[in-house]
Amino acid sequence: MRSEEPKTHVRPSWDEYFMQIAEMVGTRATCDRGRSGCVATRDKRILSTGYVGSPSGVKSCDEEGHEFHVVIHDDGSKTQHCIRTTHAEQNVIAQAARASASLEGATLYVHMTPCYACAKMIINAGIVRVVANKDYHAGARSKEIFKEAGVLFDLMNSELETYPGQAVEEGV
């Protein structure tokens, strides 16, 4: 017998579903400045996951502390980045390679717009679409190269991702 009550459950879209999984994957990250996760999919199936973390067998930020690198931007502003870890996008590609899983034609779900180095790896891995939950302060070049290479880029939320200590004060 059918119920006549209206349904209140709203089923997430595939993009929302895989983004929620990417956010959960990010809870495994080992750097508190970028607890990001990433999921690679094709045909609505997960191929690989990755999160921000130190290389296997190497101490993490959570254990050892951050390894900072200061970046001076074209406008003269400075930001600091932790370079102890491997990005979630790099790890999703590495994990797929270790499992002999091709990412050709895949969609990537990421916490924020990938950095320029990750964008180039994404293109070379054959990934055809990137879906980011938030924007990245230095993501403009990534978006440009995605467009040039024919990689579709979708931003789910226009919010800019920030983290504590991102801007460097003068004299530091």
Model-assigned labels for residue ranges:
Residues M1-V172:
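Zinc-dependent deaminase catalytic domain
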